[in-house]
């Protein structure tokens, strides 16, 4: 809990610091851009834990000399996904802003056991199909230096099949469609020189996520996330970014933690299989599944580590528990730093920079506070960033305790929300 209190203390300092202390930090450009641009581009996306997919995307920036953007994409391969979003729709210019989006998917993520000590070779492969919509309303002040938002994610999903690590499919599981909803309330204090590409200053974001849970076999809980990032310039052409992240789950209504009762409710039906190796494997997987549910009902599940945002060498969602903590450093060297208009038929806009990045991250998850710092996982690597007017193309190559990863994604790391983790 000390880490959470530290973040809250830093927030109080920020809120109580006189405005004059930040007089030397001014926005480098208008935070509500008007530079029209569009991009039609092939996509070869690699997301740790999901695999590789190919497709195409299109983005239109600052439509009709406004701040509104449109983006859409479609991917097929190891996973299928498509999405469409309208961003920065101003109901009240520069004050009340809305974002809306729709996404559908068919994925088979690698799902590991709970905890920081979970075995990398012990996992299941649930194939999931679903779709969801997102609506967010934001009130903004002082060139987007302070914002508060409410966000709703609503959709549905269902299991198509479940396989073990050897590809053996389980015959008995729930294939019915389940509705999903997550309501989020959050705020951002962004005292930096630029929202998209900060070079100096500090940014703090806090959010509370409220999953709507109607299943009587699941505990009700909510999640609080805290994300603090500082940007320290050394010269005109480089910046050191420092990030501290913490997430807690808070159980408000505890469901059953009795093994026998949960076996009746969520068991895999292994008793229907004939005695033999397949049944033994099913029983072992069922035991893991039920023990996972017991821990989830007792502690809840905070935001996970691994994937595109934190501990980038690990699969998405690799580590999860009732609490999560991580910190990271990223040194960004600006190879070019000028506004360069371009128009190549399938793309038009303004390139504002190309960066080389070097990063290192450490993080852990835990159910008991006594275990907070007992086992930390490490990830480090190098990357390339292409900064455009309104979006950043990011390429990362990283290594860690469980191997290496290559990632192509959009925008800087350490975000609270991303395309692969919108809730």
Name each region found by the language model.
Residues 21-101, 149, 174-199, 302-312, ...:
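Outer-membrane beta-barrel initiation region
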Residues 26, 110-253:
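Transmembrane beta-strand segments of outer-membrane beta-barrel domains in Gram-negative
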Residues 185, 384-388, 404-423:
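Outer-membrane beta-barrel "beta-signal"
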């Amino acid at each position: 809990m000390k880490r959470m209190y530290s973040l809250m203390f830093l927030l109080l300092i920020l809120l109580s610091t006189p405005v004059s202390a930040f007089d030397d930090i001014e926005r480098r450009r208008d935070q509500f851009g008007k530079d029209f641009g569009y991009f039609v581009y092939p996509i070869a996306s690699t997301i740790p834990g999901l695999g590789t997919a190919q497709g195409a995307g299109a983005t239109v920036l600052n439509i009709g000399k406004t701040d509104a953007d449109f983006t859409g994409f479609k991917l097929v391969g190891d996973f299928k996904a498509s999405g469409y979003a309208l961003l920065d729709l101003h109901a009240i210019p520069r004050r009340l802003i809305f974002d809306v989006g729709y996404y559908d998917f068919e994925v088979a993520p690698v799902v590991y056991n709970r905890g920081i000590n979970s075995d990398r070779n012990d996992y299941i492969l649930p194939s999931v199909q679903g779709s969801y919509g997102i609506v967010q309303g934001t009130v903004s002040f002082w060139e987007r230096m302070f914002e508060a938002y409410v966000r709703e994610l609503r959709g549905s999903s269902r299991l198509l099949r479940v396989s073990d690590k050897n590809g053996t499919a389980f015959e008995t599981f729930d294939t019915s469609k389940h509705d999903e909803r997550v309501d989020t309330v959050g705020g951002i204090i962004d005292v930096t020189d630029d929202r998209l590409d900060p070079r100096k200053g500090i940014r703090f974001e806090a959010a509370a996520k409220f999953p709507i849970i109607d299943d009587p076999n699941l505990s009700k809980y909510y999640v609080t996330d805290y994300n603090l990032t500082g940007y320290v310039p050394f010269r005109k052409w480089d910046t050191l970014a420092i990030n501290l992240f913490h997430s807690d789950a808070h159980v408000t209504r505890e469901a059953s933690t009795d093994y026998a009762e949960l076996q009746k409710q969520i068991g895999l039906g292994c008793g229907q299989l004939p005695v033999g190796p397949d049944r033994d494997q099913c029983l072992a997987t069922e035991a893991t599944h039920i023990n996972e549910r017991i821990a989830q009902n007792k502690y809840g599940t905070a935001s996970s580590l691994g994937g595109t945002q934190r501990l980038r060498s690990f699969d998405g969602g690799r580590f999860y528990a009732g609490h999560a903590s991580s910190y990271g450093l990223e040194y960004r060297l600006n190879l070019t730093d000028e506004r360069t208009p371009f128009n190549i038929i399938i793309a038009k806009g303004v390139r504002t920079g190309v960066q080389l990045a070097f990063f290192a991250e450490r993080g852990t998850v835990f159910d008991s506070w006594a275990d907070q710092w007992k086992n930390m996982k490490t990830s480090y690597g190098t990357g390339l960033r292409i900064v455009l007017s309104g979006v950043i193309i990011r390429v990362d190559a990283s290594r860690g305790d469980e191997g290496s990863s290559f990632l192509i994604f959009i925008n800087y790391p350490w975000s609270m929300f991303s395309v692969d983790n919108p809730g």
